[in-house]
Amino acid sequence: AWDMRGHGASVGAANLSTFRGWEIYYRDLIALLECLDEPVWLAGHSIGATTSIMAAARRPDKVLGLILAEPVIMDPMQGLKLWLTKLLRQSQRLSLAAGAARRRRVFQSHAAALENYRGRGGFKTWPEAWLNAYVQHAFVPQGDQVQLACAPEWESTTFAHTEHNPWPGIRQLRCPVIALAAERGSTF
């Protein structure tokens, strides 16, 4: 599995001073695809799904198909609002970006992180097994504690740059697509 820049095992590649938007994610995934001998299926959630769309559009010879869980695809009006927010330098005030910036970074243990997330916010509907898997993989050892693998500042900055329009990429797709969406109440 590939970790997007600043997420999971690729945290060392995250540089806030050079981050200008999701294009870096698209380029990273395309660079990975170019190292592979055979085309592959791509699967992703949220930003990962949108990144997969853009990589498949730009390198159709490397992608057999897509499995997309809640890709970030906004209607034009919502996209315009986000673009204006960025233009006015107010992106960090978006609810997702602001919430990510406030995320607690360090816990005494995986068990403490699990207890903190259980029944709260976006996690309140998650089965225990899913929540446990999330906590086991979203946190890395830091001394005698655990910390988020994706720094709150990086996640917040990524959310603050949610203005990308994937529609041109969607129109270029030439592979099978399986798209999954929440039945009710998604992120936006």
PLM regions with names:
Residues 99-103, 112-124, 137-139, 155-158:
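Helix-loop "lid/cap" segments that line or gate small-molecule binding pockets
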Residues 5, 26, 108-118, 131-135:
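An amphipathic alpha-helix signature
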Residues 129, 136-188:
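Conserved serine/cysteine hydrolase catalytic core
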